[in-house]
C-alpha cells in the first residue's frame, strides 16, 4: 500500500513557528581574527586591541578575557589607540571617521560600547562621479599621554586637534604655510612637504610634538607658543619616527631600508645631518642598543619576505614570517624615572597570526599564546568535537603536549589585564581539527579561548619530501641576512595526499582513527612512553576481482621503511590502506569490539585491527538488495566476494529490472537462480557515479532481526539514500585472538527521495543516543 501526499506551499505561519523554534545566535568566536588591520596596547590595564578590515574591534587580556565591538559601517579599521588606564579606545576607519569606544559594566559584565564619533570636515572620498578631496584625509593619529588631546595628521600636510573625550574640533589647526616660513630657502623644493607620516609626543615635555613629513622634513613644534623649536632636514622619504627615552634624540626610518639617529639641541635649531645613518642590510656595524624594525630588506633579493629584525650588540636575528606584518609593539617599563625602557616582550600582529617574542631570554624565543592561535595554520579539512572528556584522558593529552613543547608555559603570557569572571567549566571539552598537512591538532574547547594542547603529525609514517624541504630550510638559515622562521601559519602542504579527511575517537580507551586523502586509515593509541617499531601495514581492496577497472587518480602514500620513533602521545597501531587509494569519506571506531569501518567512493570495509585482518568489504552499487526474509541471510565473509561477480536476473537477460509491487513478485525473484557471470563495466552518468559514495558509518548494539534480541551491528549510509545494516558476530574479550569477527548482511533500506544519508544514530526508548559507556556498564 502506498500513500502520496501533495507538497504544500510555504505557509507563513509555519515559517514563523520555524523561526521561533530554530534560532541561531552567535555566542563566541574562536581562533584568529579574520583580516586584522590595526593593533594597540594599554600598559596600565594590560589589554591588547586588534582591529579588522570588517570594522570589528577585539580586546584581549588574561585568558578568557575577551570583548568585541563592531562599527555600524563596514569599513576597515586603520588605527586604534588606548586612552591609557581609562578603559577607552579610539579607532580610525578608512572612511575617515574617528570613533570613541568605552568599556562599560552591565550586569557585572564588561561590554565594549561606542560613545562618540567624529568626521573631519572637507573630506570627499572617491565616488566615480565626484573628484576626491584627500587633503583632509587622516594619515596618522597622536593621542597625548594626558589623554585630553588628539592630534590628527592629514594627507594635505595639516595637523588638527580634537578635545577628548568629546571629540570636539579645536581652533588650533597647524598648516604647512606656518612650517614653510621656518624652512631654509634651499630646502624648499616645491610647494608641498607631503603628507604627515608620523606624530610623536616629546617624552619629557608634553607641550612639544614631533611632526614628520613624507618628503623627509621633521619638525619639533611647540603647542603653546605655536612656533618651530627645531628643524631636521632629512633627504630620504620618511616612514616613521620614534623618540629615545630621554628626549635628547629620536630615530627616523626611511624608504631606502635605513634609519637615522638625530640629536635634539636647543643651540642648533636647524639640523642638516643626523648623528648616525644605518642601512642594516648593507655592511654590518656594531650596535649596542636594542633596535627593532619591520621591513628594510633589499627589494631585489628579499622583497617578497615578511620580516622583523632584532639588533642588539653582536646579536642579530631576522624573524621571517609567512604572512604580512601589520604592526608590533613592545611591553616595557613605562616609569618615567627609569633610565631605560627595559623591554621584556615583543608582540607582532601578522595578517594570519599573533607572535610574541621573549626579549629577556637568550636567543629571543617565542612565547606560546594561550589564545588567538591560528586554527587555520594549515587548511582545516575536518573536525571532531568531544564533550565530557574523562579526566584521565585529559591529563594524558596535556602531558603529551607538554613533552612536545617543554617551554610551553602560559603563566609567562605578558598580556594579562582584566579578570575572567566566568566559572571554570565542570566538563572538559576537546576539539580535534584535521589539516591539509596531515596533522591533527587538539584544542581545549572548555572556555572562550581555544588553547592548543597537542599536535599529532601523520607525515612521519609515510615517505614524503618533508625531510628534503627541512634540510633546504636549514641551509638557508645560515645565509645572510640571518633569517629565522617564526610562527606556525603555513598555508602550503608538502603533499596534498596527507590531508586528514575524517576523525573518530574513543574517549574511554584512548584510541584514535584518522583517515586521509590517499585512502590511508591510521589506527592510533595513546601511550605515555616513547616507542620504536616498524610500520604495520594492511591493505584492503574494496574492488576485489573487479576486472576492467583502472584507477586514474593519485598513488598511495608509501609507508616509511625501517623502524620509526614515536614520541609520547598517540602512536601507530596499524596503517590500513584502501585500494583504490581514493579519499576516505567516512570512518568510525568501536574500541570494545576492536573494529573500524571506513568508506570511500568505491565502497566500504570492516577491519579487525586486533587480528590485523579485514572482516568484509562491499561496493553499494554492486550489492544484492535484501528482498526476502531475514532467515535467508548469508555470511558476508563466505559469500560477499562472490556477490561482486553476480548480477540481477534482469541484467543477465538484458532487460530493465521491473519495479516490485507485490509479495508474489518478490518470492519469484528470490527463487530465481542467478548464475555467476562476470559483470559488464557499463558507463554511468555523473550522478550515478556518486551514488555509491559512503557518507556515514555507525556501530551500535541494537535490535536488527527483531524487537527482542539485540547485538552488535554496523550501519552504512550512502549518497543515493541507501542504508545498509549488518549484524556482527563479535567474540568475547577472552577469545579475540582465537575467533574472528563475522559480518552478516541484515537489511538494506532505500529512502524514496534518495537524498544523501549524512548521519546515522541509534536512540534509546527516550529518544536519546545512549552513551557507549552507559551501554558497557549495563552489560
Stretches with model-predicted labels:
Residues 1-15, 630-650, 655-665:
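Sequence/structural signature of beta-propeller modules
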Residues 15-25, 59-68, 100-123, 156-189, ...:
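Per-blade loop-tip surfaces of WD-repeat and WD-like beta-propellers in eukaryotic adaptors/scaffolds
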Residues 30-40, 75-82, 119-143, 181-202, ...:
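Canonical WD40 repeat/beta-propeller blade segments in eukaryotic WD-repeat proteins
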Residues 54-55, 95-98, 156-157, 215-216, ...:
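Short coil/turn segments within WD40 beta-propeller repeats
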Residues 273-376, 591, 602-603, 710-713, ...:
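Non-catalytic interaction/regulatory modules that flank or connect domains
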